A protein has these predicted regions:
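Short glycine-dipeptide loop
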Residues: 1-7
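A structural micro-motif
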Residues: 5, 32, 88-89
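SAM-dependent methyltransferase
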Residues: 8-77
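C-terminal lobe and adjacent flexible extensions of AdoMet/dcAdoMet transferase-like proteins
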Residues: 70-123
Length: 123
């Protein structure tokens, strides 16, 4: 990282995955349509989803694309420990509005920096 740089990333939370649960979602317009089948294992904190996309080609045919994804929910404490174990400093966990993340936050933004680097100024 740059001497004054930060490491910023986001992650979806257990709260978010529980809220979408085991549901299916779909949407369609002229250029693309999708079907999203979601499954959340609360015990393992693993969210699995199958996504099928239909994308309109130039000749007006629709090409099908299938994807499968898995995401794990990590607590802020787990992320903090991983950051500190990597030799970085955990600065904060915030929501989309910049407020401290809570148990009801859907997406958490994590801010960290390298140890020994100059603290952020004029942020």
């Amino acid at each position: 990282l740059d001497p004054n740089g930060i490491f910023l990333f986001d992650l979806k939370t257990d709260h978010y995955f529980k809220s979408i649960g085991c549901q299916s979602f779909c949407d369609a317009d002229e250029e693309v349509s999708f079907i999203w089948d979601n499954d959340y294992d609360e015990e393992k904190r693993i969210n699995s989803y199958a996504l099928t996309l239909f994308v309109q080609e130039e000749d007006n045919r629709y090409e099908r694309f299938d994807e499968y994804h898995e995401q794990r929910a990590f607590s802020i404490d787990e992320v903090r420990c991983a950051i500190e174990e990597s030799g970085m400093i955990f600065l904060s966990a915030i929501d989309k509005n910049g407020a401290p993340a809570t148990k009801d936050t859907d997406r958490v933004y994590i801010i960290a920096r390298e140890k020994g680097k100059t603290p952020l100024q004029n942020l």
